[in-house]
């Protein structure tokens, strides 16, 4: 319970080991799970909180994944959806590492190009490569620009 507001306790229990993804853009928690390949049939024990009040963001989502630490490419995917997200690595109930996500300048093999004629969508063994711009994601093979709904293009 908080000393300032006794009506506010912990929304979900702490985890012993794993990852807490905090400050996810409100409404994006389920997309974060999807791009991490976490479904209802996977083995991870999850805690999800959506539209939680946040002084800094107004509203935010939080995801706790027990017994799993994220790989760099997974963190890069999260950065595309939630650029303000914080990744907390938990070991024995303690935060041992806390870092913000960084959107890379170039992403490879993370996003599928929506252009059906792009070489990355053929049988050629070519990984998609996008330059990250303020206005969206620019395919370096076919010059296609993804401006909206990036979550649906993440592999």
UniProtKB/Swiss-Prot annotation:
InterPro entries: Asp_carbamoyltransf_reg_N (IPR020545), Asp_carbamoylTrfase_reg (IPR002801), Asp_carbamoyltrfase_reg_C (IPR020542), Asp_carbatrfase_reg_C_sf (IPR036792), Asp_carbatrfase_reg_N_sf (IPR036793)
Cofactor remark: Binds 1 zinc ion per subunit.
GO terms classed as biological process: 'de novo' pyrimidine nucleobase biosynthetic process; pyrimidine nucleotide biosynthetic process
Function, as annotated: Involved in allosteric regulation of aspartate carbamoyltransferase.
Similarity comment text for this entry: Belongs to the PyrI family.
GO molecular function annotation: metal ion binding
Residues reported to bind Zn(2+): 113, 118, 139, 142
Description of how the protein assembles with itself and partners: Contains catalytic and regulatory chains.
Cofactor(s) demanded: Zn(2+)
Organism: Methanoculleus marisnigri (strain ATCC 35101 / DSM 1498 / JR1)
Keywords per UniProt: Metal-binding, Pyrimidine biosynthesis, Zinc
GO CC annotation: aspartate carbamoyltransferase complex
Protein name: Aspartate carbamoyltransferase regulatory chain
Top-level taxonomic group: Archaea
């Amino acid at each position: 319970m908080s000393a300032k507001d006794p009506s506010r306790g912990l929304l979900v229990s702490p985890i012993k080991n794993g990852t807490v993804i905090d400050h996810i853009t409100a409404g994006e928690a389920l997309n974060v799970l999807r791009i991490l390949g976490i479904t209802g049939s996977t083995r991870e024990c999850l805690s999800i909180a959506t539209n939680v009040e946040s002084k800094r963001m107004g509203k935010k989502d939080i995801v706790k994944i027990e017994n799993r630490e994220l790989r760099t490419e997974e963190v890069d995917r999260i950065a595309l959806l939630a650029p303000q997200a914080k990744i907390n690595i938990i070991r024995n109930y303690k935060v041992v590492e806390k870092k913000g996500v960084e959107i890379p300048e170039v992403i490879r093999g993370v996003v599928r190009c929506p252009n059906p004629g792009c070489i990355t969508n053929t049988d050629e063994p070519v990984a998609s490569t996008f330059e990250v711009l303020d206005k969206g994601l620019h395919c370096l093979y076919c010059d296609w620009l993804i401006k909206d709904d990036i979550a649906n293009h993440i592999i």
